[in-house]
Amino acid sequence: KLNKDNKYKTVFRKKSRSLASAFVRGITETSGDYIGWLDTNQSELAPKFNIMIKELETDSDIVIMSRYVSGGGDDRLLLRSLSSKYFNLFARLILRIPIKDLTNSIFLMKRKVLDEVTFLGYGHGEFFFEFLYNAYKKGYKIKEIPHLQKRDQNAQDSKSAPNLIRFFYYGVLYVLRIFSTILRRRN
């Protein structure tokens, strides 16, 4: 049950499937002090937003549910969980930031972050690590709290799981986005 003191707004989209476009729509339609999201296949995590709000009320600007901090984990198929873990390690090393889970995108943040941090609203999940990178470089405090990623109920739960070609396609897009993020930051 959600905390009655906090108000939540849910936006349902039926046509566009782009994660980045969902983010753009969400932030244009929201008016609260905190902005966050999670995919509908993870809606059981909504009550954890109350924990995230408490973190924001203390000393954090962005709170991420992370698979790669103590207490978190990844229960998906071995190929998916290992590739995600090693991609996050690779991204963290290349981007030189301490965030351990750059691709989970279950988060809550203070609205003020959007006043300074811009992002390019295209792509699948790769726009999120660019957003986190830019927020970190501007000095915003990012806190990760543990999250156990459950096994996908079916292949349609993931954009990358249905076949290996698609899996590697998204992997290449993510790697390209890492390097373009660095180049944009230098300009």
Where are these regions (language model features)?
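A short, conserved beta-strand element in the Rossmann-like catalytic core
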Residues: N41-S43
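Short loop/turn motifs at secondary-structure junctions
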Residues: K7, S31, D59, G139-K141
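Catalytic donor-sugar/metal-binding loop of nucleotide-sugar-dependent glycosyltransferases
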Residues: I97-P98, G123, L132-K150
